[in-house]
């Protein structure tokens, strides 16, 4: 059966020693997309968002850069896009 992907789930995985930035990172994401926090610890944050188009992918790329700016040089950001 052929079908076209209608939405994508994006997973932001953030590791950092600066957990004080978690709330500002979540606020940044919430300005653009509804989100769900999958895991939040002192050094690790995993957030999922739902996107629908290629314009959203560009926003995700920009968000990843902004999040990295908040956690560098003590952490890193990984973004995974899962198509459905």
Task: Report the location of each language-model feature.
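Short intrinsically disordered terminal tails
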Residues: 1-3, 83-84
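Short glycine-/aliphatic-rich beta-strand segments at the starts of folded cytosolic domains
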Residues: 2-16
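Polar/charged side chains located within well-ordered beta-strands of beta-rich proteins
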Residues: 11, 46-48, 79
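Short amphipathic alpha-helix segments
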Residues: 13-34
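Serine/threonine-rich, low-complexity intrinsically disordered segments
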Residues: 15, 43, 53, 81-84
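Short, intrinsically disordered low-complexity segments
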Residues: 33-72
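A short amphipathic beta-strand at an alpha->beta junction
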Residues: 72-84
